[in-house]
Every structure is written in C-alpha cells, then in structure tokens.
C-alpha cells in the first residue's frame, strides 16, 4: 500500500450532479434551471453588482477625495540598524550597493528611517531621510548624502 493507491470510501465521496439525463433523475428536462428566463440560458445570469436595473450601490455613493496616482512616489524603506548590519564592515553605503544586492529595484527612490541604534561611523546615500535617522547618524559622526532626483 502506498500513497497512489489511497482513495476515499465511496460513501464519503460527493457525487457530481448529472443534469439533463432523464426525468427520473430529478434533474432532467430543464436541468434544475426552471422554465425559460435569463438564468435558464447557457452563460445566463447577471454580472456581479447588477441590481436589476436599479441604480447600483457603487454609483449611488458619491465620489470622495482626490487621488493623485500619476504623480505618486513610492519609496523603498530601510531602517538604519538593518542597513548597517546588512552592510557590516562598510563605512559607506551607496545607492548602487542597495540596488546591486537587489534590496529594491533599480530606480526606486530610497528612504532611510531611524529605527534601532547604530554604533559605527557610516555614510549613507539615499533620496530621503527621516528626522530620527539624520539625528542618529550625526550623533555617531556619520553622514547622510541626500540625492536629488
């Protein structure tokens, strides 16, 4: 006996509904779809959200807010302590290093946050820094190089 010979008992298996196979089956003739109408047709039924011609909910509710999606900038976010442990022994962390290690895709702007603590003097290159990250870098004598896009 092995895994390929295992099968459930016949009583436990739910049999599929065989429709349109004679009136004695209980699902013959109209195959459980009733008489005529949109739902009786092949591919019949209404799309999700259709309310029978009534103004649907998503159109009754007003538009809200402003979405500036075209100009939205998504930053790749890294914490100071994580970056310094990842690049242990380096005293300069450049954007090329972050991109070459595939920590984020090339061209994605990078923001450094100030979570955790750092002990070694390090120079970090990024597009943005949080106030806490700048404060912690300057406390240990490190530098933050802000890159203009």
Curated annotation (Swiss-Prot):
Quote the cellular component terms of the Gene Ontology held in the record: cytosolic large ribosomal subunit
Any GO molecular function: structural constituent of ribosome
One of its GO biological process terms is: translation
Region of interest: Disordered = 21-54
Keywords on record: Ribonucleoprotein, Ribosomal protein, RNA-binding, rRNA-binding
Q: Which Pfam family, giving just one, matches this sequence?
A: Ribosomal_L27A
User: Which InterPro entries does this UniProt record tie to the protein?
Assistant: Ribosomal_uL15, Ribosomal_uL15/eL18, Ribosomal_uL15/eL18_sf, Ribosomal_uL15_bac-type, Ribosomal_uL15_CS
Origin: domain of life: Bacteria
Keyword rRNA-binding included in the entry's annotation:
yes
Q: Which first-to-last residue range defines the signal peptide?
A: none
SUPFAM superfamilies in the record:
Ribosomal proteins L15p and L18e
Per the record's keyword annotation, is Ribosomal protein included, yes or no?
yes
Task: Write out the biased-composition intervals (Gly residues).
Answer: 23-35, 42-52
Task: Tell me, in a sentence or two, what this protein's role is.
Answer: Binds to the 23S rRNA.
Regarding protein family, the annotation reads:
Belongs to the universal ribosomal protein uL15 family.
Q: Which HAMAP family match?
A: Ribosomal_uL15
Looking up NCBIfam families in the UniProt record yields: rplO_bact
Oligomer and partners: Part of the 50S ribosomal subunit.
**Can you name this protein?**
Large ribosomal subunit protein uL15
């Amino acid at each position: 006996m092995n895994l390929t010979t295992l099968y459930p008992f016949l009583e436990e298996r739910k049999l599929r509904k065989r429709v349109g196979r004679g009136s004695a089956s209980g699902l013959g003739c109209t195959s459980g779809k009733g008489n005529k109408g949109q739902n009786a047709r092949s591919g019949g039924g209404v799309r999700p959200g259709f309310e029978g011609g009534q103004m649907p909910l998503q159109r009754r509710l007003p538009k809200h807010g402003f979405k500036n999606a075209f100009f939205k900038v998504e930053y790749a976010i890294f914490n100071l302590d994580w970056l310094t442990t990842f690049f242990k022994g380096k005293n300069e962390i450049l954007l090329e290093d972050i991109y070459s290690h595939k920590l984020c895709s090339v061209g994605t702007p990078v923001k450094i946050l100030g979570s955790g603590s750092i002990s070694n003097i390090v120079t970090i290159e990024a597009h943005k820094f949080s106030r806490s990250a700048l404060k912690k870098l300057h406390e240990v004598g490190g530098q933050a190089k802000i890159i203009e896009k």
